[in-house]
Amino acid sequence: MTELTLQEAIFTVSNLRNQLNKEYAKFDTEYRVPVAVNNESIVNDGKAADVKDSLKKIEQMKHDIITLKAAVHHKNITGKLTIDGAEYTASEVLESLKLERDIVNNLQNNTAFGYHRERIKTVAGVGIVEEGIISEKEVLEYIEALEVKVNRKSMLIDKFNSTEIIEAELKTI
C-alpha cells in the first residue's frame, strides 16, 4: 500500500497521464513501421517485445490512474471542511468553487471595457453614447465579495489536499 496526500495523488495522476501519452506516441512513431516485405515478416523480436512492454505499462498506468482517481473522489465525498461555521464535504466545496470562479470570470468579462468595448462612443445621428452595466457598482461589489470567498475556499482546499492522506495499491510506483 502506498500512502499519498491528495496533492501528491493528483500530481501523480497528472504524471501518469503524461507517461500514458508518451506510450501512445510510440504507436504512432517507433512501432508504426513496415512489418512485411513480399509477404514475409521483417519484425524483429526486440521490437515485438517492446510493444508488449508498452501494452503492459499502459495497463499498469490505467490501473493506477483509476485507483488514484477513485481514492481522491472517495476522500472528497467523505472529507469535511468548515466554512463560516457550516460543514461541507470537500466535493461540495470544489463544486461551489468551480461555479463561483466561473461566475467571477463571466461577470468580469462582461463588466470590463477596453479593446473593442469602449464605454463612450459617438454614434452618427444620435450623439455621444455612454455604455455601461445596469447597477454596475452593485455588480462590481458582488464580484469583489465573491473573489474573497473564492480565495478563502481555494486556501482551504489547498490545505485539505496537502494534509489528507489516501492509501492505494499502485503498480507503477
PLM region descriptions:
Residues 1-173:
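Structural preference for solvent-exposed beta-strand-turn elements
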